[in-house]
Amino acid sequence: MTATLPAGLPAILPGHGLAGQVALVTGASRGLGRVIADALAGAGAAVGLVARSAGPLAQTADQLTAGGATAVAVTADVTDPRAVAAAVEQVSRRLGPIDVLINNAGAAGPYGALWEVDPGDWWQAIEANLRGTVACTQLVLPSMIARRHGRIVNITSQAGAYRWPLVSAYAVAKAAEIKLTENLAAELRHTGVTIFSAHPGLLPIGLSEQALTSRAPEDPATAKVFSWIRRELEQGHGADPDVAARFVLRLAAGDCDRLSGRHLTVHDNLDTLIAQADEISRHDLYTLRRAEL
């Protein structure tokens, strides 16, 4: 049902661990965010956890500390700039300056054709996916740049690189995040800070979980989207959450810095891409571009 581990993914190169570093993960109360937080803690990082749901977020923190990790949980809505600023300040004060930011918080948004969905719901999904990423990134960058050290991983989606009919808000937001990653990489060149767009694959947790566990929805658009998700996972086109977390961990750990600004996926062989980094840069690959004749 799930993809196997791609070659070149699991190992972090010597000297590129996260011991002594501070990582901040948004959307850390459940799903992929929780799995990523656990992977970061396992690599030696102290982890700041941010999410809206206080109860599940506390469970994530308890899980990490029970394993011997250092973790701080802060309840905050990433679409609220003041709440984000307070969360970043609290994590930095208690754990130290943030070295790694994982922008994972997001929402699928309304399902349906654009002219049929509620405009407010559509824009709310854009904010949940994009505004939080921008707010968190803006807040951690000054310290990273001053220290000439930092890595940011934006959890995006192939929906932003291609299309996802009936899920336009999510696809548009993810496309914006992919382009934000590319633009920031150019702005951050020579600062010591790198940034990546990371597609974790279609997972059986998080945004897909409702499709797997809910009864058949009455809304035709939602039913169609859920049916597609179930079919893709049943046909083995998904990814394992632990594999996805190790993919993100490798980007955060430093040995992929030559790929800064690129849109990468869990199915990529990172060792091969690192070896081809000069060619990738020369031909401007792994970015969003218009295909021409």
Write out the residue ranges for each language-model feature:
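The beta1-alpha1 cofactor-binding region of Rossmann-like NAD(H)/NADP(H)-dependent oxidoreductases
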Residues: 54-55, 75-87, 119
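Catalytic Tyr-X3-Lys loop
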Residues: 115-134, 149, 153, 177
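Active-site helix of classical SDR
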Residues: 137, 173-176
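A short, exposed helix-loop element centered on a Lys and neighboring polar residues
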Residues: 137-138, 182
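Conserved glycine-rich cofactor-binding loop
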Residues: 22, 29-30
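Conserved mid-core segment of classical short-chain dehydrogenase/reductases
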Residues: 108-123, 166-169
